[in-house]
């Protein structure tokens, strides 16, 4: 057992059991959790940092402020594309990105499978998360 009183180790069995194939086709998560490379590149997900995915490069902190990147036409265009039927998260991206659980929850909410509810407890669920 790896967990103790200070650290809780949680195996993400759902990621293992689904063999890396997400249940969703549209990629909603990046709007809530962008990724930034060490060079300042802002992309919807780390898997898109490579130059061959330059059409997904939203901006770069070296050249512009986050506020300007966030309010840019590029940001809107890329986020709308990822959430559209033209993008298939099951075939057009890498295996289970950091935004996986956000995308999964939003997909279930939009489809009416499981609505997202406000938290009832004021204590954050992940106050010890690393």
Task: Show where each model-derived region lies.
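Short, acidic, Ser/Thr-enriched surface-loop or helix-capping motifs
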Residues: 36-39
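Short, small/polar residue-rich loop motifs at catalytic or cofactor-binding pockets
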Residues: 26-30
């Amino acid at each position: 057992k790896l967990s103790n009183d200070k650290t809780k180790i949680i195996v993400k069995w759902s990621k293992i059991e689904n063999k890396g194939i997400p249940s969703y086709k549209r990629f909603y998560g990046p709007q809530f959790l962008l990724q930034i490379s060490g060079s300042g590149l802002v992309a919807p997900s780390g898997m898109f940092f490579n130059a061959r995915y330059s059409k997904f490069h939203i901006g770069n902190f070296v050249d512009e402020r986050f506020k300007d990147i966030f309010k840019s036409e590029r940001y809107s265009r890329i986020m709308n594309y990822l959430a559209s039927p033209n993008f298939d998260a099951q075939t057009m991206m890498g295996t289970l990105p950091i935004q996986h659980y956000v995308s999964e929850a939003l997909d279930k909410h939009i489809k009416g499978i499981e609505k997202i509810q406000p938290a009832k407890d004021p204590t954050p669920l992940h106050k010890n998360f690393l």
